[in-house]
């Protein structure tokens, strides 16, 4: 690999793993999506930015190097998402707050500071995600809800809006009507603790965490994609 890095590693950093092999077919609008992701991520977080690029085409690499210019840029062959995450997290000291995201997320202003409030405000936090979806309550939530049953207030209901679920379905290519029907019988879980309210879910697609907390569960793997729920479940089992 090759890249650019600062002389001193920061105590907080937002990181994204990019992948754009070409601009044909499925990928024909992907460059614009990645640009929107990275710009909104940086605009909403007053912290340094790191990009790990997994063997993308020149169009993206040129933009990253010449226009976007992240604080840390690593240009790698395609090692896969999980291996890239393992390598990134391993660069930083255990107390570093690191955010890791897919390259197709859209961030709202203030997303970083609000996420850090939850990370520091709740005890024994594994991950904090800035985007909830009702389907994600189906896995990796048992430790969170077990803790909340004795230490906080739990609420169940439909708090995630239909528009937010519609946006989620559109972003992952699931028919909207089919998705809304699937989640209609499910419920969101919210936890109130020490003046804060959070959904009882977080997942691999986008999160912030302490590097040392998640390092044992970041694995090198020969697979480019897939199997990532095991990361969420391992974090949850850790308590």
Report residues per predicted region.
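Acidic helix N-cap motif at the loop->helix transition within catalytic regions
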Residues: 25-26, 58-66
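Conserved donor nucleotide-binding strand/loop of the catalytic core
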Residues: 64-79
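The conserved acidic donor/metal-binding loop of glycosyltransferases
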Residues: 102-106
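N-proximal low-complexity "stem/linker" segments adjacent to membrane-targeting elements
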Residues: 1-40
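Active-site nucleotide-sugar/metal-binding loop of Leloir-type enzymes
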Residues: 86-97
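A conserved acidic beta->alpha catalytic loop
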Residues: 40, 44, 52-61
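Conserved catalytic core of nucleotide-sugar-dependent glycosyltransferases
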Residues: 112-213
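C-terminal catalytic/acceptor-binding lobe
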Residues: 1-10, 30, 179-239
């Amino acid at each position: 690999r090759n890249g650019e890095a600062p002389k001193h590693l920061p105590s907080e950093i937002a990181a994204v793993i990019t992948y754009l092999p070409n601009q044909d077919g499925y990928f024909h609008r992907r460059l614009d999506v990645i640009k929107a992701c990275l710009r909104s991520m940086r605009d909403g977080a007053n912290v340094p930015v790191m990009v790990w690029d997994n063997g993308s085409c020149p169009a993206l690499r040129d933009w990253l190097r010449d226009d976007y210019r992240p604080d840390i840029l690593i240009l790698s062959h395609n090692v896969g998402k999980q291996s890239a995450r393992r390598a990134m997290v391993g660069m930083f000291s255990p107390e570093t707050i690191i955010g890791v995201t897919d390259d197709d997320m859209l961030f709202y202003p203030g997303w970083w500071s609000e996420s850090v409030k939850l990370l520091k405000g709740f005890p024994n936090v594994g991950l904090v995600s800035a985007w909830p979806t009702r389907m994600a309550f189906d896995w990796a939530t048992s430790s969170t809800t077990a803790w909340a049953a004795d230490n906080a207030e739990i609420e169940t209901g439909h708090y995630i809006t239909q528009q937010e679920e519609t946006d989620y379905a559109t972003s992952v290519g699931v028919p909207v009507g089919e998705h809304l029907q699937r989640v209609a019988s499910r419920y969101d879980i919210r936890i109130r603790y020490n003046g804060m309210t959070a959904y009882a879910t977080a997942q691999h697609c986008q999160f912030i965490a302490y590097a040392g907390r998640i390092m044992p569960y970041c694995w090198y793997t020969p697979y480019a994609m897939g199997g990532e729920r095991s990361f969420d479940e391992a974090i949850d089992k850790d308590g």
